[in-house]
């Protein structure tokens, strides 16, 4: 029978895609999916379990639902995703309010879990996290005009600080046909921007063709009518080759924005991280990318406070950032993840010091970003409109901005959400741009 269900999605974009798949299955089964927990038969929390802050957020959400359940406003709680995969026994023992769990290999069984839990069971579905990828439809929940497209699952990089391979399993590529078919379906829905994601998109095809084949996939995606922007997230530096660089430079649909997680520039820290490139190799790659791809915007993520990072290593990182002037940077203080090599390393940096260093990098980066935005003033830039207020003020993003992590363009004009329009940039403030739509 149909039930009233609320699905709460936490964590990263990859997790959001899993939530969209579960929404699709629940809708297909005839369940009523709503946005409020009160009065629901089942609340599903799709969790992240990667770093301490994400784990805390997930546990807090579960405890909030437990209070609603205790008050009679909710019947059952299901927990899915990375936290349940990683801490199955702990959740069972410490959170008796949880009525069932699904791991990262079992999203396709969500409807069975709902039926089970509503009939008095306590379902524990933990399929093979390294098994074949199950192709499931999606209910797109992102903003108008754009959607994530996940091209692979799992990870084979085994960075010393990261538990993702243990949580999500080995790297598995989706097939070319499955990805292209999904992209066409997204285009048919009005999606203009595909944001290509995986834990490591540069490795796509290794398990299918015996070599990294991202360029092959991107050529096929670029053929799809209606798709105007293809944005690339999480390219590992050691696999970016000349074929891929040439394609990015010459294919108009691939936006000149690359998210390359570098994490650090000091050789010893990179070695401790089990990264597979040196500081000099990173410098050479970024120099090559700048030379070959005009207008390139680079984003990276960094970690401060890894065991062994002293003042000298941190200062090398800051000096490099001042020199290379990356347009977009995310930084995280080191979080020791149990079961990872970095969690048992000696020569620890105190958490407060790791946070202080992260804050210093953000302060440094804010000035670099402000300089980039100031240089945009006077330019006419293509903007994907995402919101339009009753006042007529619109907001959206240029090619230089990825949703939720980068800046916004606020502009006057007649654009509707999902439209791609030309905006004359007239100002900037606190990481965002201002402008006026040019009516063509």
Locate predicted features.
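Conserved, mostly hydrophobic/aromatic
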Residues: 159, 179, 196, 232, ...
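Short beta-alpha junctions and helix-cap segments that line functional grooves
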Residues: 244-245, 317, 410-411
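Terminal RNA-binding accessory module
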Residues: 344-440
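A structural micro-motif
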Residues: 3, 31, 75, 99, ...
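Proteins enriched for Cys/Gly/acidic motifs involved in redox and nucleic-acid/cofactor modification
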Residues: 1-204, 243, 258, 280-291, ...
């Amino acid at each position: 029978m149909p039930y009233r269900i609320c699905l709460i999605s936490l964590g990263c974009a990859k997790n959001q895609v899993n939530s969209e798949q579960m929404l699709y299955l629940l809708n297909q089964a005839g369940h009523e999916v709503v946005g409020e927990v009160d009065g629901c038969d089942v609340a599903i929390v799709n969790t992240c379990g990667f770093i301490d802050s994400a784990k805390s957020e997930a546990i807090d959400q579960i405890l909030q639902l437990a209070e609603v359940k205790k008050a009679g406003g909710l019947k059952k709680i299901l927990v899915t995703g990375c936290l349940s995969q990683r801490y199955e026994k702990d959740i069972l023992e410490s959170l008796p309010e949880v009525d069932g769990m699904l791991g990262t290999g079992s999203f396709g069984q969500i409807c069975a879990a709902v039926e089970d839990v509503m009939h008095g069971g306590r379902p524990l579905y933990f399929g093979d996290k390294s098994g074949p990828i199950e192709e499931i439809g999606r209910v797109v929940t992102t903003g108008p005009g754009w959607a994530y497209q996940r091209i692979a699952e799992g990870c084979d990089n085994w960075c010393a600080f990261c538990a993702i391979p243990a949580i999500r399993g080995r790297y598995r590529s989706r097939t070319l046909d499955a990805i292209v078919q999904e992209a066409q379906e997204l285009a048919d829905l009005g999606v203009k921007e595909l944001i290509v994601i995986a834990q490591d998109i540069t490795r796509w095809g290794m398990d299918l063709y015996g070599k990294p084949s991202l360029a092959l996939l991107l050529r096929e995606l670029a053929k799809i009518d209606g798709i105007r922007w293809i944005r690339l997230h999480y390219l590992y530096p050691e696999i970016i080759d000349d074929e891929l660089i040439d394609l990015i430079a010459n294919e108009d649909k691939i936006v000149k924005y690359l998210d390359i997680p570098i994490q650090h520039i000091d050789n010893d820290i990179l070695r401790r991280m089990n990264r597979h490139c040196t500081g000099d190799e990173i410098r050479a790659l970024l120099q090559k990318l700048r030379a070959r791809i005009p207008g390139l915007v680079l984003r990276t993520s960094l970690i401060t406070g890894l065991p062994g990072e002293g003042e000298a290593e941190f200062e090398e990182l800051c000096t490099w950032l001042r020199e290379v002037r990356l347009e977009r940077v995310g930084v995280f203080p080191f979080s020791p993840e149990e079961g990872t090599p970095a969690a048992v390393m000696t020569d620890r940096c105190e958490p407060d010091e790791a946070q202080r260093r992260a804050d210093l990098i953000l302060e440094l980066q804010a000035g670099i970003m402000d300089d980039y935005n100031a240089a945009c003033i006077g330019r006419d830039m293509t903007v994907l409109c995402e919101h339009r207020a009753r006042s007529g003020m619109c907001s959206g993003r240029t090619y230089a901005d990825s949703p939720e992590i980068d800046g916004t363009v606020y502009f006057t004009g007649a654009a509707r959400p999902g439209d791609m329009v030309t905006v004359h940039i007239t100002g900037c403030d606190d990481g965002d741009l201002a402008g006026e739509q040019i009516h063509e």
